[in-house]
C-alpha cells in the first residue's frame, strides 16, 4: 500500500465530476487500499477518489474514534436516495487544510452503492456519518466546502488563502 498525495484547493481536479465505475478489478482494489491508508495517515474521516487525483466515483469513510474498532465504509458509485432534516455543524476538508466552517447538511441520509466486492449496499446514516457521506459524495460531483458557503465567507477564504476566483 502507498500513501497518496491529497490534492489541495485550487487544484482543478477537485472541480471535475467523477466518472461511474463500471469494472471492479485489481487496480481498483489497490486504489481502495491506498485511499484507506491515505485517509488514516491524514487523520481524516473520509476521502473521495478525486481528492487523490482519480476521477472515479469512489469514497472511503470511517467516523469511528481511532482508539475504537474501525467502522470503515467503502462505497463505489454512491448516491443519496433519501434525506431529511437539517443540522448546522462545523466541517473541514483534507483538500482545504486549515479551513473549517459551519455548514447546513441533511440530518439523515440513505446512501446506496456497491461495496468493494461489487455487492449492492444501502446505508442509513445520521450525525457525523451522514455529514461525512454527503461531503464525500459532493467531491464526486466537483463540489467543495467553499462552494456551499456565502459569497462573503468565500471572499474571506480567498483572501486568507490567497487564491483567485
From Swiss-Prot:
The record's SUPFAM superfamilies line, in alphabetical order, gives: Peptide deformylase
Q: Which positions are catalytic residues?
A: 136
**Residues that, per the record, bind Fe cation:** 93, 135, 139
Q: Which residues form a coiled coil?
A: none
EC no.? 3.5.1.88
Q: Which cofactor does it need?
A: Fe(2+)
Top-level class of the enzyme under EC nomenclature = hydrolase
Key words, A-Z: Hydrolase, Iron, Metal-binding, Protein biosynthesis
Biological processes, Gene Ontology terms: co-translational protein modification; translation
As to how many cofactors bind and how, the note says: Binds 1 Fe(2+) ion.
Name the domain of life: Bacteria
Which reaction(s) does the protein catalyse, per the Swiss-Prot or TrEMBL entry?
Answer: N-terminal N-formyl-L-methionyl-[peptide] + H2O = N-terminal L-methionyl-[peptide] + formate
Keyword hit for RNA-binding: no
Please name the Pfam families in this protein's record: Pep_deformylase (PF01327)
Single GO MF annotation? peptide deformylase activity
What does this protein's UniProt record list under function?
Answer: Removes the formyl group from the N-terminal Met of newly synthesized proteins. Requires at least a dipeptide for an efficient rate of reaction. N-terminal L-methionine is a prerequisite for activity but the enzyme has broad specificity at other positions.
Q: Which PANTHER family match?
A: PEPTIDE DEFORMYLASE
- In which family does this protein belong, per the annotation? Belongs to the polypeptide deformylase family.
What's the name of the protein?
Peptide deformylase
Q: Which organism is it from?
A: Thermodesulfovibrio yellowstonii (strain ATCC 51303 / DSM 11347 / YP87)
Q: What is the lineage of its organism?
A: Bacteria, Pseudomonadati, Nitrospirota, Thermodesulfovibrionia, Thermodesulfovibrionales
Give the gene symbol.
def
Amino acid at each position: 500500500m502507498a500513501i497518496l498525495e491529497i490534492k489541495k484547493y485550487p487544484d482543478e481536479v477537485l472541480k471535475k465530476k467523477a466518472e461511474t465505475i463500471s469494472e471492479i478489478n485489481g487496480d481498483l482494489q489497490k486504489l481502495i487500499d491506498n485511499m484507506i491508508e491515505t485517509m488514516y495517515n491524514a487523520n481524516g474521516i473520509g476521502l473521495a477518489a478525486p481528492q487523490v487525483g482519480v476521477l472515479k466515483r469512489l469514497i472511503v469513510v470511517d467516523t469511528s474514534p481511532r482508539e475504537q474498532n474501525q467502522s470503515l465504509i467503502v462505497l463505489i458509485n454512491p448516491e443519496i436516495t433519501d434525506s431529511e432534516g437539517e443540522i448546522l455543524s462545523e466541517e473541514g476538508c483534507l483538500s482545504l487544510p486549515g479551513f473549517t466552517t459551519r455548514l447546513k447538511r441533511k440530518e439523515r441520509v440513505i446512501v446506496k452503492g456497491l461495496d468493494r466486492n461489487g455487492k449492492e449496499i444501502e446505508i442509513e446514516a445520521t450525525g457525523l456519518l451522514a455529514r461525512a457521506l454527503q461531503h464525500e459524495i459532493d467531491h464526486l460531483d466537483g463540489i467543495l466546502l467553499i462552494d456551499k458557503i456565502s459569497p462573503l465567507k468565500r471572499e474571506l477564504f480567498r483572501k486568507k488563502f490567497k487564491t483567485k476566483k
